[in-house]
């Protein structure tokens, strides 16, 4: 064989062998450098990365000082699963089953009967007044410390009815990565949820890295009093504030006092929050998670009992909001799925 041809073949083999060795390590290195590794390369991921780069680049017209970098996130259906029902509703159902043993007279009410008997048809058509009554019975007439313990004990043992995993494992890996990425870029991350503020506060820091003072949600009535000479906050019957739809911008103003520049939601209950955030001066970004993955999660939007998304889909384009397509955009949904 011609010596030059032989040398060329040797070089080709060496290069190919070197490529086989380096490819896995290069892929690993690239993945390690990717701040959102569970996101597929898509318009959604690109929009997030470009926006963050835009507002954090010093010396540019769109630079936003760290103290103004505020991002708000809905919780149910945006950060964790809301199917087959809101997690707080599952908490209410379990609480009712315990309460009726102590107070059998509660079974005189149809909503309580339906919970104990498992009448899903009735439960899917609960009136707002019945839901309020269930929340009051299961959340009120105790101190905030007592309620915190009840929530912590429940969240530590309760399991998702479909995945049979703790609810705290049923969080969306890509969204947790996003929270971490934003905080690394000096954003302050807030939860703005229609769920109960005191239901979320006991566990969100350990799951999302969001401290309790950065949680905004619906609130029940409370009162300060001395119990056995100990200063105590008591939970009372009655709803004080509903942090849903038009209540979300109000909650943001009450708790934060600044208009956020980033907003993430998944349902029509988040419409006004995204509308408020993206109407701000300067660069803003609003995004909606659309549940399109029937294999890894649940596909739903316009017809869902929980997390209905219809108006947001219709208006997203004209409002300039991005749609995050779960099936298309996420490489991984839950931590227990690979």
Go through each PLM region and give its residues.
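Bacterial N-terminal signal peptides that target proteins for export
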Residues: 1-13
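Bacterial N-terminal signal peptides
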Residues: 10-25
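C-terminal cap/substrate-recognition subdomain and adjoining C-terminal extension
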Residues: 29-39, 43-49, 53, 68, ...
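N-terminal carbohydrate-binding/catalytic regions of secreted carbohydrate-active enzymes
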Residues: 51-70, 83-84
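Asp-based phosphoryl-transfer active-site loop
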Residues: 69-84, 274
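Secretory-pathway/luminal and periplasmic proteins that interact with or process carbohydrate-rich
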Residues: 80-82, 122, 202, 213
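Short, solvent-exposed loop/turn and secondary-structure capping segments
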Residues: 82-85, 90-93, 202-203, 276
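A metal-dependent, Asp-based hydrolase signature
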Residues: 85, 90-169, 173
């Amino acid at each position: 064989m011609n010596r030059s041809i032989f040398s060329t073949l040797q070089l080709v083999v060496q290069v190919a062998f070197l490529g086989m060795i380096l490819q896995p390590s290069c892929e690993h290195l690239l993945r390690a450098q990717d701040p959102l590794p569970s996101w597929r390369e898509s318009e959604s991921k690109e929009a997030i990365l470009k926006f963050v780069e835009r507002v954090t680049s010093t010396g540019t017209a769109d630079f936003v000082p760290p103290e103004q970098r505020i991002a708000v996130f809905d919780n149910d259906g945006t950060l964790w699963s809301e199917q087959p029902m809101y997690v707080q509703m599952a908490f209410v159902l379990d609480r009712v089953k315990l309460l009726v043993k102590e107070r059998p007279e509660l079974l005189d009410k149809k909503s309580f009967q339906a919970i104990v008997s498992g009448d899903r048809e009735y439960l899917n058509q609960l009136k707002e007044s019945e839901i309020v009554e269930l929340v009051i019975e299961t959340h009120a007439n105790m101190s905030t410390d007592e309620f915190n313990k009840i929530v912590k004990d429940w969240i530590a043992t309760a399991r998702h009815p479909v995945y049979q995993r703790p609810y705290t494992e049923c969080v969306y890996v890509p969204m947790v990565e996003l929270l971490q990425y934003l905080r690394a870029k000096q954003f302050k991350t807030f939860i703005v949820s229609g769920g109960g503020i005191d239901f979320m506060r006991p566990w969100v820091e350990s799951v999302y890295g969001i401290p309790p003072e950065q949680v905004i949600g619906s609130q029940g009535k409370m009162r300060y009093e001395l119990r056995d000479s100990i200063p105590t906050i008591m939970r009372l019957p009655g709803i004080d504030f509903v942090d849903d739809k038009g209540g979300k911008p109000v909650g943001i103003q009450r708790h934060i006092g600044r208009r956020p520049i980033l907003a993430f939601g998944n349902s029509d209950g988040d419409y006004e929050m995204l509308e408020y955030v993206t109407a701000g001066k300067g660069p803003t970004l609003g995004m909606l998670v659309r549940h399109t993955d029937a294999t890894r999660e649940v596909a739903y939007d316009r017809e869902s009992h929980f997390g209905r998304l219809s108006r947001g889909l219709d208006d997203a384009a004209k409002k300039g909001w991005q749609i995050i397509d779960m099936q298309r955009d996420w490489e991984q949904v839950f931590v227990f799925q690979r």
